[in-house]
Amino acid sequence: MNLEKYSERVRGFIQSAQTMALSRNHQQFTPEHILKVLVDDDEGLAASLIERAGGNVRDVKLGVETALEAMPKVEGGNGQLYLAQPLAKVFSTAEELAKKAGDSFVTVERLLQALTMEKSAKTADILAKAGVTAQALNQVINDVRKGRTADSASAEQNYDALKKYARDLTADARAGKLDPVIGRDDEIRRTIQVLSRRTKNNPVLIGEPGVGKTAIAEGLALRIVNGDVPESLKDKQLMALDMGALIAGAKYRGEFEERLKAVLSEVTSANGNIILFIDEMHTLVGAGKADGAMDASNLLKPALARGELHCVGATTLDEYRKHVEKDPALARRFQPVFVDEPTVEDTVSILRGLKEKYEQHHKVRISDSALVAAATLSNRYIADRFLPDKAIDLVDEAASRLRMQVDSKPEALDEIDRRIMQLKIEREALKVETDDASKDRLVRLEKELVGLEEESTEITAKWQAEKQKLGLAADLKKQLDEARNELAIAQRKGEFQRAGELAYGKIPELEKKLKEAEAQDGKAGMVEEVVTPDHVAHIVSRWTGIPVDKMLQGERDKLLRMEDEIGKRVVGQGEAVQAVSKAVRRARAGLQDPNRPIGSFIFLGPTGVGKTELTKALASFLFDDDSAMVRIDMSEFMEKHSVARLIGAPPGYVGYEEGGALTEAVRRRPYQVVLFDEIEKAHPDVFNVLLQVLDDGRLTDGQGRTVDFRNTLIIMTSNLGAEYLVNLGEDQDVDAVRDEVMGVVRASFRPEFLNRVDEVILFHRLRRKDMDRIVEIQFKRLESLLVDRKITLSLDHEAIEWLAAKGYDPAYGARPLKRVMQKELQDPLAEKILLGEILDGSTVKVTSGSDRLNFRSKPTVVATEAAA
């Protein structure tokens, strides 16, 4: 006996059988030991062969176990095993069978065959009693082998290769496991057309990720099962190849090729009855290629060219260009079928078809208006993904969120339960007290506790009953779905009596029960069970940060008072505040042009009048955070090439993978304020990039991705024409110099750029009367810095007037005032705090002197503590 002639699996079994014989204290190594390890094998090749040959595996296991138990045991032996004569004959028979079949190695099935044939071995009787005959087993082995010989030590791995490395889509379609495929008739028809060709009958579905390429393959499987295909495709099997399973565990060179050859051999020997579906087809190129080995695509080419292999591929446009088109020999063997993104209307139809499956899974109802909202909102607000995938995901997540709410405790019940817990803790504390007041309190508390516990029990029962009703409707939907699948199977098999019972008996009855259950659910209760457009809008807002969901009354009031809110921070610029507020209100009311940014403005005015401050105030108003904006300082973009910093470097340049400062910020957060500060400082060519942003609300970055700017508010600031605005009189309006200022602007920017901006807003130079208000705003900021120290500041009217007069300079706006306040107020205050003249918790009154401010400090903490 030469072990080199045996396959790896058989060698492993022989070793396991020896170990088992020693562990059972047997002295002889017999055929029963071999049969025992064969039928106990996890991968179950021997067990599968016995079943297919008409035998009972359970009977074999019982028979072999009984035989092993009856064997003599030798305690305290020398650990040696003796080969029994019957087993030697079994090995000899197995080697002869392998030689006769032209095999290079003795495989598991030949060993099993020898166990049935060798009459001197008890295993032949055990297998015969279980219903296995040598003739039946031989027939099954020939079916499994399909004419192939065992040429390698791992030959068993390649039996039933399609079962291991592919999924039968037609079997899934028959079992009703596939989602219905709605629409896509043209693409499926085109795929069938290519499959029906004589040669090169291999379509490849090419489209963006998420447009439904895999769904088309599933649609083809459903059509084959329903017989809705031409004669040439009737009763074909569509198998989805799993490239991951094919490559996984192929450790040695040649193992991957062997597996793939086994798959191809099975497909070829099926005489065109198997169509192979390869999802992510680009993975074929280079798959398994290592140390000079052939990759999968080269192994497939000959079979594809001869028409022996029927194949449907699917890949994205980018991957097809990157991998498949580079190999023209592979590309010419496939016929591209382009799959476009469906329209919003088609997406709604697709969602309607899938609705039942999602209702069944989440056990909630999904309204039709929610499906329409999912299609329209995803199309408008989720720019970097494709329909119908993004719309399906929205519906799925909205239903998941609602289900989570249904399973969570209602708010009213949660509040009562928390109150009960609080009272129970209080009761335990009061039990220790002996005074009358505590005893009275305990009696009252016990009474309240009883009432709350009754209320809690009542609400819990009501909530559980409503949940149960929802569960009943979900169960009925599941039963209805199963009944419809059963009806389809019965019609396909021609079992018309069963089909009639289902169509006119069971299905109408279930539909009636479901209608009644849904009518019960429809009544208002504690549990919300229908997914509405509001739920979908909430998910969109969570994904993108864009406020699409329904405005609450508080937000409406806030938007209507927007001018007043921003006016608290920006002084003397009513026209600018109003223009920006109107743009935001238009956007939130849904009346803005959906293909342009929310608004685009150029703020013109002298330095220090509040151009950048207005933008910060706007970001703070919309997002409660001054820094919630993209601020691009255009003074950094004075060279022509610096535009790459905005949109990202082109391919081949350093930093290509990093993306641009502007495009990446907006991609991550599509709803925000974008500020281009000091635009006149930038190189004129930089503005060419902004033309598409201002007109179409989109920009293509260095990597070719389209970034959506339709939900941004674009503000540009500039000092152009400031000299005209500074020289205006105290009571003169900016319209008096508008033409002169616009003349300077037109000389600096191209007409096509200015023509795309919504409005050019001129900022007034700050008047003397505005300065008092600015002093108050700056003073409030200083007060907020002292909150931690509990120091209270107060500034009298004369001090405000003194600071405003000292800090007023029409040419420089509010910035000189900031410097004056720093020098005259903050610096002396800091010194006094450090010297200990002003203590934490003091009240400081600031008054004006002839040439400086006076500080009077009065400690308040001590008094407060004494009172306490």
Swiss-Prot record:
Binding residue positions for ATP 1: 207-214
Keyword Lyase carried by entry: no
Listed SMART domains: AAA, ClpB_D2-small
Region described as NBD1: 160-341
Annotated stretches, region: NBD2: 555-765
Coiled-coil ranges (or none): 392-523
Location of the region described as Repeat 1 in the Swiss-Prot/TrEMBL record: 6-71
Region (Linker): 342-545
GO molecular function, one term: ATP binding
Binding, ATP 2: 605-612
GO annotation, cellular component aspect: cytoplasm
Key words of the record: ATP-binding, Chaperone, Coiled coil, Cytoplasm, Nucleotide-binding, Repeat, Stress response
Repeat 2 as annotated region, ranges: 83-147
Entry-linked Pfam families: AAA, AAA_2, AAA_lid_9, Clp_N, ClpB_D2-small
Region described as C-terminal: 766-868
Chain ranges of the Clp R domain: 3-147
Superkingdom per UniProt: Bacteria
Protein localization: Cytoplasm
A GO biological process held by the record: cellular response to heat
InterPro entries to which the protein is assigned, alphabetical: AAA+_ATPase, ATPase_AAA_core, Chaperonin_ClpB, Clp_ATPase_C, Clp_N_dom_sf, Clp_R_dom, ClpA/B, ClpA/B_CS1
Free-text comment about domains: The Clp repeat (R) domain probably functions as a substrate-discriminating domain, recruiting aggregated proteins to the ClpB hexamer and/or stabilizing bound proteins. The NBD2 domain is responsible for oligomerization, whereas the NBD1 domain stabilizes the hexamer probably in an ATP-dependent manner. The movement of the coiled-coil domain is essential for ClpB ability to rescue proteins from an aggregated state, probably by pulling apart large aggregated proteins, which are bound between the coiled-coils motifs of adjacent ClpB subunits in the functional hexamer.
Protein purpose: Part of a stress-induced multi-chaperone system, it is involved in the recovery of the cell from heat-induced damage, in cooperation with DnaK, DnaJ and GrpE. Acts before DnaK, in the processing of protein aggregates. Protein binding stimulates the ATPase activity; ATP hydrolysis unfolds the denatured protein aggregates, which probably helps expose new hydrophobic binding sites on the surface of ClpB-bound aggregates, contributing to the solubilization and refolding of denatured protein aggregates by DnaK.
Protein family (similarity comment): Belongs to the ClpA/ClpB family.
Quaternary state and interactors: Homohexamer. The oligomerization is ATP-dependent.
Protein name: Chaperone protein ClpB
Lineage per the UniProt record: Bacteria, Pseudomonadati, Pseudomonadota, Alphaproteobacteria, Hyphomicrobiales
